[in-house]
Amino acid sequence: MSKELTAKKRAALNRLKTVRGHLDGIVRMLESDAYCVDVMKQISAVQSSLERANRVMLHNHLETCFSTAVLDGHGQAAIEELIDAVKFTPALTGPHARLGGAAVGESATEEPMPDASNM
């Protein structure tokens, strides 16, 4: 695999960097004894963002490593590896799983993550 990040990996990396900053804001909220419900909302926003990053990585894996493995005759092993990777990921396998849509650009209706640093 190439050392250069794919567009999807860059998107996931950028999202994770945003999450890191958001988590720092949540820590500050807790340290300043912020209202519990406000903290819970921010934690939910981070969880949602992590789930989106995971979906982006799934799309990337399917388009790169997985497809290469299938073309190279290692399809069954690739399928087993993928099943093992997602079986404990409710956002990918649960009743509300959203695997479709724009993985990199995100949908136009998606709301941006609130900025916890201003809380």
From Swiss-Prot:
Phenotypic consequence of residue 35 to F: No effect in ability to bind copper
Localization in the cell: Cytoplasm
Entry keyword set: Copper, Cytoplasm, DNA-binding, Metal-binding, Repressor, Transcription, Transcription regulation
One GO CC term, this protein: protein-DNA complex
One Gene Ontology molecular-function label: DNA binding
Signal sequence range: none
Outcome, altering residue 61 to A: Loss of ability to bind copper; loss of ability to dissociate from DNA in the presence of copper
Swiss-Prot/TrEMBL induction comment: Highly up-regulated during the early stages of invasion of the human blood-brain barrier.
Pfam families: Trns_repr_metal (PF02583)
Keyword Zinc-finger among record annotations: no
Keyword Disulfide bond: no
Record-stated family: Belongs to the CsoR family.
Assembly: Homodimer.
Protein name (database record): Copper-sensing transcriptional repressor CsoR
Lineage, broadest ranks: Bacteria, Bacillati, Actinomycetota, Actinomycetes, Mycobacteriales
